[in-house]
């Protein structure tokens, strides 16, 4: 018997590009929503970069400074895009044989589930993410799911 992933005809290249595109567009959506509704840019962006960077660099990086920090931003970006690609590859397994409309619907659901996993599941290990639980982050996760699903479907048809 062959392993499950060998039986699912996932286009891994399309999933890679879908993860990168979704990571970029979801981040842009989050920044636009912060700008429109919170008035706390760039500080909130620097906060989230430190929250992500602390996964690798440790919680000692968390004392919040409202300043750009190259090491934190580089590590946060690496984590963000690594997870974006992994999540996109997982999503691809659920939509590989679906049409575009169904894929987008699954992407929306995936975004909601991803928000729960990231903001409630991972906070058991990384409790500092609790402060990032808000509607803007939820919307960004849903945008991620929509973009990852639609981009994967379009690219996988080529």
What is each PLM-predicted segment?
Residues 23, 27-28, 111-121:
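Aromatic-anchored segments of alpha-helical transmembrane domains
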Residues 128-140:
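Non-cytosolic membrane-interface motifs at loop->transmembrane helix junctions
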Residues 141-153:
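Hydrophobic cores of alpha-helical transmembrane segments in multi-pass inner/ER membrane proteins
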Residues 39-70:
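Extracytosolic (periplasmic/ER-lumenal) interhelical loops and adjacent juxtamembrane/interface segments
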Residues 95-113:
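Internal alpha-helical transmembrane segments of multi-pass membrane proteins
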Residues 120-128:
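Juxtamembrane "helix-exit" motif on the non-cytosolic side of transmembrane helices
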Residues 63-83:
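Individual transmembrane alpha-helix segments
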Residues 6-43, 49:
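N-terminal signal-anchor transmembrane alpha helix
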């Amino acid at each position: 018997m062959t392993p499950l992933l060998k039986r699912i005809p996932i286009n891994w290249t399309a999933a890679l590009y879908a993860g990168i595109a979704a990571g970029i567009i979801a981040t842009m959506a989050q920044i636009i929503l912060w700008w429109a509704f919170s008035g706390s840019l760039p500080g909130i962006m620097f906060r989230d970069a430190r929250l992500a960077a602390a996964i690798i660099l440790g919680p000692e990086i968390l004392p919040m400074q409202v300043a750009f920090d190259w090491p934190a931003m580089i590590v946060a970006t690496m984590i963000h895009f690594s997870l974006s690609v992994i999540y996109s590859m997982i999503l691809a397994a659920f939509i590989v044989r679906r049409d575009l409309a169904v894929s987008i619907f699954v992407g929306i659901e995936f975004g909601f589930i991803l928000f729960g996993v990231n903001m409630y599941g991972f906070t058991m290990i990384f409790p500092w993410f609790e402060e990032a639980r808000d509607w803007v982050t939820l919307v960004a996760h849903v945008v991620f799911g929509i973009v990852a699903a639609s981009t994967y479907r379009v690219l996988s048809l080529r």
